Amino acid sequence: MADPEELQVSSPPPPPPSSPSSSDASAASSPGGPVSLGWPVPSRSSGPTVDQLEEVELQIGDAAFSLTKLLEATSAVSAQVEELAFKCTENARFLKTWRDLLKEGYDSLKPDD
């Protein structure tokens, strides 16, 4: 995720103090006052916001790790299911062949009419 400093760099720069817009007239009249441009400008009290961003990033990282582990486990189970299906198919083929042989043997022991 983007670093908070990168977010500040990517936001549009404020206009020069010499040309304030009409909505900035009251803020520009006090020297050194903040200039409101209609988008959120991080203030010095942005510490909790940065902490919240870091917490969200950690939660996303934890979720991604958990999802990766879940994918690995699902892949392993999927491979086991495929192997089991193959073995079941082999067993079914064997049982069918065995049944056919038993039937032939039984039929060969019957007296001819």
UniProtKB/Swiss-Prot annotation:
| Region span, Disordered | 1-50
Cellular compartments annotated: Cytoplasm
One GO CC annotation: cytosol
Highest taxon of the lineage: Eukaryota
Arranged from A to Z, the UniProt key words for this protein are: Cytoplasm
Q: In which tissues is it expressed?
A: Expressed in the kidney, in epithelial cells in both proximal tubules and distal convoluted tubules.
What is the protein name for this chain? Renal cancer differentiation gene 1 protein
Query: What's the source species for this entry?
Result: Homo sapiens
Q: What taxonomic classification does the UniProt entry list for its organism?
A: Eukaryota, Metazoa, Chordata, Craniata, Vertebrata
